[in-house]
């Protein structure tokens, strides 16, 4: 009897994840096959990301790798996703199409930040209008159901904020893709466990595309995803996070009773880093949108570590956070939030002190004729 029940469980798991696996593999193959010709085409037309003082690469690199990422994702969804005429689906895929077009134009002509920001707000409002909103904090700060105006406000802030956070974290080889892949797999698994198998397919399809892209993007990068990819990546992750909160908030026995802080853990590194950098710039009397080299990855690369090491270390920290935020699920949400913020502050303090230590020892070594490597 136990054996029969065990095999029944396996069959149920396979039923839930077989289309997820098909989406992931299809997107992976399409993206893997699409990137080489895109690299050749981009080189031919000179659509290259040129090095400058605030960028980490030292030679021109083809950009717009997002074309292959979106091509892989949409091919997989076209084959395996149950499309219908529901307003939420229509608004979601329309928004992706618009952001994809904006990303292409930005990579080609460098659009103004204000123009992109206005479009993002409009698309976020459209998603909220389609009934995909942050409706409850699930008891976080003692808040449960939100008033309608607050639902729209927090939804728009979350989508625009997360979209831009992933766009800004895309500063060194493999970082945005690595963080995005781990976040998408996590979202896909927990959406499936929460009963929303169809929405999970979107996460797995984009994860497959990102995994193939990383093969060409890890140091030394052969192509960048550009705004064509990073804007869509951040937007999709934001929408899926809201959906995960929504399905757990309405469940009688939710898989994630602490869904609000869990989804915060999924996007913690890019969001925390963006808020920290903006706060420091404002504190110093500078525009928060004025680019510099103070992001979390710069704390490592400025110290002398390679892109590869910096990306892998930050992704390792991200993985630890994902495990930590799930492991702490039995605690009160406010306490979990405090632990997450304290952990990120500790990481930043350690990285800043590492930078000072290495620079100090480098100066000492150079003064005494010791080679630093």
Ranges and model annotations:
Residues 2-41, 46, 70-86, 90-97, ...:
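Alpha-helical transmembrane segments
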Residues 91-120:
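Hydrophobic alpha-helical hairpins/lids featuring a short glycine-rich hinge
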Residues 97-98, 102, 119, 123-134, ...:
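Membrane-embedded alpha-helical core segments of multi-pass
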Residues 75-87, 105-111, 129-141, 247-248:
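Transmembrane alpha-helix boundary signature
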Residues 50-62:
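Juxtamembrane helix-capping/reentrant segments at transmembrane boundaries
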Residues 145-157, 200, 258:
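Membrane-interfacial loop-to-helix junctions in multi-pass transporters
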């Amino acid at each position: 009897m136990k054996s029969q029940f065990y095999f029944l469980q396996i069959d149920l798991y396979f039923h839930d994840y077989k289309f997820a696996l098909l989406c992931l593999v299809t997107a992976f193959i399409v993206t893997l096959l699409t990137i080489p010709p895109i690299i050749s085409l981009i080189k031919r037309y000179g659509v290259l990301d040129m090095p400058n003082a605030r960028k980490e690469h030292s030679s021109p690199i083809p950009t717009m790798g997002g074309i292959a990422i979106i091509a892989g994702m949409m091919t997989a969804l076209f084959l395996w996703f149950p499309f219908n005429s529901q307003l939420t689906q229509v608004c979601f895929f329309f928004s992706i199409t618009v952001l994809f077009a904006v990303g292409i134009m930005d990579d080609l002509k460098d659009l103004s930040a204000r123009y992109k920001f206005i479009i993002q707000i409009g698309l976020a409002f459209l998603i909220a209008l389609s009934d995909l909103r942050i409706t409850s904090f699930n008891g976080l700060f003692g808040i449960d159901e939100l008033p309608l105006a607050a639902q729209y406000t927090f939804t728009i802030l979350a989508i625009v904020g997360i979209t831009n956070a992933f766009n800004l974290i895309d500063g060194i080889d493999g970082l945005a893709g690595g963080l995005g892949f781990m976040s998408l797999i996590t979202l896909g698994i927990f959406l499936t466990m929460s009963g929303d198998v169809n929405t999970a397919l979107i996460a797995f399809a984009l994860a497959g595309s990102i995994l193939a892209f990383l093969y060409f993007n890890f140091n030394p990068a052969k192509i960048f995803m550009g705004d064509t990819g990073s804007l869509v990546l951040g937007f999709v992750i934001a929408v899926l996070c809201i959906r995960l909160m929504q399905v757990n908030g309405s469940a009688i026995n939710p898989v994630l009773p602490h869904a609000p802080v869990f989804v915060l853990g999924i996007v913690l590194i890019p969001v925390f880093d963006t808020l920290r950098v903006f706060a420091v710039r404002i504190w110093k009397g500078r525009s928060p949108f004025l680019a510099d080299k103070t992001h979390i990855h710069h704390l490592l690369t400025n110290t002398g570590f390679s892109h590869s090491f910096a990306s892998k270390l930050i992704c390792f920290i991200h993985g630890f956070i994902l495990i930590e935020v799930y492991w702490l699920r039995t605690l009160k949400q406010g306490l979990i939030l405090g632990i997450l913020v304290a952990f990120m502050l500790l990481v930043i303090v350690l990285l800043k002190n590492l930078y000072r230590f290495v620079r100090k020892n480098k100066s000492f070594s150079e003064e005494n004729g010791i080679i630093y490597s």
